[in-house]
Regions:
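Glycine-rich phosphate/adenosyl-contacting loop at the front of the ribokinase-like
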Residues: 1-41
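Active-site cofactor/substrate anionic-group-binding motifs, chiefly glycine-
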Residues: 36-78
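Hydrophobic beta-strand scaffold residues
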Residues: 39, 87-88, 167
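A short helix->loop->beta-strand "cap" motif at the edges of active sites that frequently abuts
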Residues: 79-86, 165
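Conserved phosphate/ATP/ADP-binding segment of small-molecule kinases
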Residues: 100-182
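Short, small-residue alpha-helix embedded
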Residues: 125, 196-217, 221-226
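Short pre-catalytic strand/loop immediately N-terminal to key active-site residues, enriched for Gly-Thr
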Residues: 186-196
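Conserved small/polar residues in nucleotide/adenosyl-binding loops
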Residues: 235-242
Length: 247
């Protein structure tokens, strides 16, 4: 599944419009290039409709909101819906402030998303209308664990069914569901929490995956999540040369 989805990205080179945050914009662009996609960044309201029109997908990330970018998100999102383009929402920090929460909830209500990807606290905020997000990180009390896995799976399947899109909850254990099926992915790495932006990068990459695999959004999303975890695993695992030097 991963190989086929990634091969389709490399073969089709999907152009992805990213309205993302200022902290990770360069990293998101580079990850899109690395996986085989093509990035373009724009949040100016007078520009976004034209940019969205020439792209195959739209990645909306609310990490550094301002009035201009919020307006641009709604214009781009509605244009993407009009053109039947694939759209992903990354509700960064939803639950941490009224502006973030209100914006994320309104986006989810007014725009038809194919995928919503976030940590467990952000997704709970969207589903329940309030949350306990710790800044832009998930609250420890919300974390998906082996002990609460059944409840977490039931929650994500229920919200996916109600929202009508694929929901991806990422963390130490990742959950990806369309309301009927749920992938449980256990290749998260603790090192990923030591740098900022891995979630933002994943959202950009996931958008490329769903554009290149339009008939298999659930599988494409799960494949993107797996790919990110495997990339981190390969990077953090000692090479044979490193192991020999450590003896």
């Amino acid at each position: 599944m991963i190989g086929n989805c990634l091969e389709n990205v490399r073969k089709n080179v999907p152009l992805v419009h990213n309205i993302t945050n200022y902290v990770t914009v360069n990293d998101v662009a580079n990850v899109l290039l690395a996986c085989g996609g093509s990035p373009i960044m724009s949040d100016e309201p007078d520009d976004v409709a034209d940019i969205t029109s020439i792209c195959g997908g739209l990645n909306i990330n609310i990490g550094t909101l301002n009035k201009n970018s919020i307006e641009g998100m709604f214009i781009a999102g509605k244009k993407a819906n009009e053109l039947s383009h694939k759209i992903l929402l990354d509700p960064v920090g939803a639950g941490a402030s009224k502006l973030r929460t209100d914006t994320a909830v309104k986006l989810a209500k007014e725009i038809k998303f194919d995928v919503i990807r976030g940590n467990i606290s952000e997704i709970k905020t969207l589903a329940l209308g309030s949350g306990t997000t710790k800044g832009v990180d998930a609250d420890v009390s919300d974390a998906v664990t082996e002990e609460n896995l059944d409840n977490a799976v039931a929650f994500v399947k229920d919200y996916a069914k109600k929202s009508g899109c694929v929901i991806a909850i990422t963390g130490a254990i990742d959950l990806v569901s369309d309301g009927e099926k749920c992938y449980v992915i256990r290749n998260g790495r603790p090192e990923m929490s030591k740098i900022t932006g891995t979630g933002c990068q994943l959202s950009g990459m996931t958008t490329a995956f769903i554009v290149a695999n339009p008939d298999n959004v659930l599988e494409a999303t799960a494949a993107a999540v797996c790919t990110m975890g495997l990339a981190c695993l390969l990077y953090t695992s000692p090479s044979p040369r490193d192991r020999s030097l450590s003896r």
